[in-house]
């Protein structure tokens, strides 16, 4: 019987150090890649596509429950409608200002994600152990055959599963977590008091900023504590540059924007003639009052008025608007 890595789910092997699942001793619980990532922060790139993940997700039946995990920063739910029975779990609640009311957030998210297959929406913080009991009891309530945790890379899915393991079992299992894509490589089965939990690899979000920035930047954009929203008063033709990732040029009259982004990410004002990021062709975006602008896995921006923007950014990074959640 093949033995799986407890960290990423890949089958362990001792023959080829250049292939996935390599370990020096088959008795080890984790592969070398997971060991070095956890203990030394060394990340080894693994090429994956959503074709690989779709094969795994095709095993999910109508008798199963999908716990669809998404970060509060972007609320990605691309594959959510593929499943019959879902709980939508919004993670990283702790990174938003404490002044925000959970019930109002949940109500606005419910309007954005008004799908018939969603049984519940639960906002959680794995770091603060907030609403974890609520999630666990909700999973138990439905008593489905299997309980699949599904979500995009960097959604906080594996961190959430580790919190469940820590809270409700005495098993010495730690799913490998990191800010990098493709940390989990195959399914990981975990039994919690008779409930079958299945962690799946993080879905690759083709429009994510993570695919286009450096490893150092990936660490920086991942919020580690409560975000301090940054408000900018902007005049016509005013320009902001976000960490050599995005250049935002304000085309309309005076107004303000409030940026929700990791505190460590640098944002600077530049003049119109400054060439930074002008090598990217501008995307023209129209924003209505009461909408957010979302740059996938980087930030969301709230505007106080109707606005016309030019945004210089890699063409493959997804930008979208939505009704504001704040």
Task: Indicate where each model-derived feature is located.
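Glycine-rich nucleotide phosphate-binding loop and flanking beta-alpha elements
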Residues: 74-76, 156, 167, 204
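Canonical P-loop GTPase G-domain recognition
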Residues: 95-155, 161-174, 178
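Helix-rich effector regions associated with P-loop NTPase G domains
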Residues: 1-66, 73, 84-87, 93, ...
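Residues that form or flank phosphate/diphosphate-binding pockets in enzymes
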Residues: 77-78, 130
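Conserved Rossmann-like nucleotide-binding pocket used by diverse enzymes
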Residues: 68, 89, 122
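Conserved beta-strand elements of the Class I
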Residues: 65-68, 148
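Alpha-helix C-terminal capping segments
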Residues: 57-61, 78-84, 112-113, 138-142, ...
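Short hydrophobic alpha-helical runs that function as membrane-insertion/retention elements
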Residues: 87-88, 148
């Amino acid at each position: 019987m093949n033995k799986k890595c407890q960290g990423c789910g890949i089958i362990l092997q001792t023959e080829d150090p250049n292939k996935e699942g390599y370990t020096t001793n088959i008795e080890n619980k984790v592969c070398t890649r997971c060991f070095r990532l956890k203990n030394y922060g060394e990340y080894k790139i693994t090429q994956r596509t959503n074709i690989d993940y779709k094969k795994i997700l095709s095993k999910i039946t109508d008798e199963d429950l999908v716990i669809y995990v998404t970060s509060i920063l972007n609320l990605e739910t691309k594959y959510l409608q593929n499943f019959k029975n879902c709980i939508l779990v919004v993670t990283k609640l702790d990174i938003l200002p404490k002044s925000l009311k959970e019930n109002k957030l949940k109500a606005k998210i419910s309007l954005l994600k008004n799908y018939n297959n969603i049984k519940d929406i639960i906002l959680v913080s794995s770091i603060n152990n907030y609403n974890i009991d609520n999630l666990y009891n909700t999973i138990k309530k439905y008593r489905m055959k299997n309980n699949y945790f599904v979500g995009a890379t960097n959604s906080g899915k594996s961190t959430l599963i580790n919190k469940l393991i820590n809270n409700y079992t005495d098993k010495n299992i730690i799913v490998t977590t990191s800010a990098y894509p493709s940390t989990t490589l195959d399914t990981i089965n975990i039994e919690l008091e008779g409930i079958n939990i299945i962690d799946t690899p993080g879905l690759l979000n083709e429009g994510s900023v993570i695919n286009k920035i450096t490893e150092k930047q990936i660490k920086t954009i991942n919020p580690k504590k409560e975000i301090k929203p940054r408000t900018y008063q902007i005049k016509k033709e005013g320009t902001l540059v976000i960490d050599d990732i995005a250049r935002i040029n304000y085309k309309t009259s005076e107004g303000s924007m409030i940026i929700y982004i990791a505190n460590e990410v640098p944002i600077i004002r530049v003049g119109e003639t400054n060439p930074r990021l002008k090598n990217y062709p501008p995307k023209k975006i129209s924003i209505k009052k009461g909408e957010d602008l979302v740059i996938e896995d980087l930030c969301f921006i709230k505007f106080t008025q109707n606005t016309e923007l030019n945004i210089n950014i890699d063409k493959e990074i997804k930008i979208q608007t939505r009704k504001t959640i704040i």
